[in-house]
Amino acid sequence: MSEEITTNQTVEEEQQTNQPRLSNENIKQEDEEQQVQEQQEQQQQEQQEQIDDQDTQQQEDEFVVLEETKPVEPIRPTPTLQETPQQQKQQTQEQEHEYQDIVQFIDHKGDIVKEDNKNGRTTFLSTLSNRDDFLTKGFDYSVISILGPQSSGKSTLLNLLFNTRFAVMDASTGRKQTTQGVWMGVASTTNNKNETFLILDVEGTDGRERGEDEKAFERKTSLFSLALSSVLIINMWAHDIGRYNAANISLLKTVFELNLQLFQKKRNHKILIFFLIRDHDGVTPLERLKATLMEDITKLWTDLQKPEEFVGTRESDFFDFEFTTLPHKIYSPTAFLGQVEQLKQRFSDSGADSFIPKRKYRNDDIPADGFYQFSYQVWETIKSNRDLDLPSQKEMLALYRCDEFVEQSMTQFTRDIKPIKEHIERGRIQEQFGEKSKRILDQSLSVYDEPAQRYHLETVQKKRQVLTDRILTELKYLFDKQMERLNENTLVFYNSLIKEFTDSNTGSSSGSGNNNNKKRDGSSVLLTAASVGIIPQFSTWSNGIKKKSIEYFEIVANQSIVPGSDWSFENDLEQLKIKIDKELSILKENQLVRLSKLMRDKTFQQELTPLLTKITEQAPNNMWQKIKTYYDDALSSNEKEFRDRLVDFQLDEQKVNELINKFREQLADGLKNKITERAEFLQMRMRKRFEEKFNMDNRNLPRKWTKTDDIASIFQDARQNAEKLIDLFSYLRLDEEDSNVSFFKRLDNDEHEENTMVNSSKIIIPYKDCCLACENFRLTIKSDYMQALSEQNRLTSGGGVPGYMIILLCVLGFNEFISIISSPLLLLLTILLGGVGFVLFKLGLAGPFIDYSSQILVHFISKVKDIVLHVEQLQEQNHNNNNNNNNTPKQKRE
């Protein structure tokens, strides 16, 4: 902190030390100055008495620091003699309203001050965080720092110019160091609230408290001030001009050297070095003082060891210089306060030409909200004795702040995208995804751009790209999810088109009337095809369905791409096309199967089945010739229709031939199955054919057997004719070479054998089944033969029973007849047996009944015989056992 000069003796000694030899004119001037000084001393004594009366409660500490709980009262301007007490009070209240809080940034040890709630210590960061009026300034602020000797009144001057509260020295307690380290404060001038200043009060140079470490710390604080400042105030005494050490020429040298160090890589802006010459008595004009200082500055710049790229440069290439003077504060308080007020106007009136902190001196790389972080990095770098690369520090600041802005933007993005994300993750399509995402992206980038635009442009652009990539990565994830769902929805859309077509087509076919189905033209085939779900002109239709599905996908996919991104849905589209082609391929195969089945069923149901039923029912000897004729006609006509229908599927010739051959095989298999089905009633047909030949005459009337009929020959011919059906139904004879093939061959001995030279795939009834059918048939017709023989024998025996036999039967059987009549049980039994016998006789079943009864009787007798033999064996065993038992005692007795 700066200290107030209050001791007259020190001032007089310093002025005397710097006095040149006096000429006569100088002696006269000295007398005049002596009179002025005496008047000033008298005024000072009067003013001091007034100050003592007002400040009786002044603090007892040697110096005041900001860490104290109660803020230090600032140095207020000494009232002029013309001001009344009421005016003084009003002025004090107005200024009190404008006072600004200040905090220590760097302490005496060179460490950045940390927060200490226990001791009430606040940091510059916490202070700035509560100053929205400063944080929102962007680049519209100026940093003003002050350098100069210790106890030269720096803090007092800052308090008067900017209404700050920097602590000042109490000269009555001794001249000691007050400002320790670096203090900062945000200030605005009274006349212009739009002008905002960040004030740096730097520890004075040449202080005895630091001793040998003074130069090192002085260099660090000077470097720190130069790195941050727009205006650098050099506070110096007028009587020190012309000296090297007292005039702080070494400090200027440090400033020049550090400037070259800071801006070796990049020149940013000029710095205004404002020389404030204190205690100017007016003897030496300001122009002469300015000329002396500029001469020293030029020589100092020339003597500097500059880097190669700065050889030949002038100090004006890096700095602007301004000079002003202030009279002695104690000896000329009225003039001092007046000139301070004028100087204050130069800091507040931005419209005036004499305005000091012009915009061109501002650092446009450090916005207000990033100032603390930048200053923190700068000091840490300086403190660690590393070379300070100011452009790099600004880039580091931009990195730090831009990272914060990126996270803020991502938070905004996450909040805005949440509804869309939830919608997509629930498996739904987000309409206008690309447009909505672009709007959210732009909003998120605007959240970043607005505060970031004030920082290092290249860094901002890099971080903006990082932010854009992060957001686009999140959006790409949702886009991929959208594409997956769109792929599924497109397949659903594709299936809906198919269902809609098939439903409408089937409905129209079912309502078209049955009369059209009786037509033999192509329309009947189309209607029949539609009724079973066959799609006409499949290739044209499938291409249209695929085109509509792809168009649906592309419309939604194009709406899902974020404008400006390099996204593409080509891979998704290719996958969709593959899936649709696969679905269409499956549908095509299904349609071909349906068409094949339709043509097969149509061939059988409408053409072959009625004819086959009729032919197999009659089963003529030329059955297979007729079947082959009808089969070939149906195959030829339907094969032509099948080929015409296959044109709609755009198949290659190989595939068409494959389907036609399969169609032929299916027809042949179907015919074989149909014959097999009809062969299930082979026994009935054989019986029917046998009866037609054996029991019916040439006039197709029931046969009356006569004595001259050769029953055996007729029976054999009828049986052989019926047994031909077995061979007829046992083998498929569609090929020309099979027309004369006999599978169940009859031998001369009336037996049969298997033809092993035939194609086994054409066998309908296996040989064993043929033999079994033949054997069963012969058993069933045996009774017919026996009955015919019985009838013929009855006719051969003459005119029936003789009359005497009837008379003899009546005489001899009269008693039995009476006993039967008298017994109801015997009468009922006789009636039942007689009725059964009469029915059997009339039905011609008497012979089979006798044969069957004979078999039962023989079986019964055999069983009885077995039982009798078994009983005899048991008796013989018992007899033998008894004999053995009788012989055993005899042997014992012997």
Curated annotation (Swiss-Prot):
Residue ranges annotated for the GB1/RHD3-type G domain, each copy included: 138-361
Coiled coil: 21-60
Positions that bind GTP: G148, P149, Q150, S151, S152, G153, K154, S155
A biological process from GO: regulation of endoplasmic reticulum unfolded protein response
Cytoplasmic domain ranges by topology: 1-800, 846-894
Bias (Low complexity): 1-10, 36-48, 78-93
Protein name: Protein SEY1 homolog
Organism: Dictyostelium discoideum
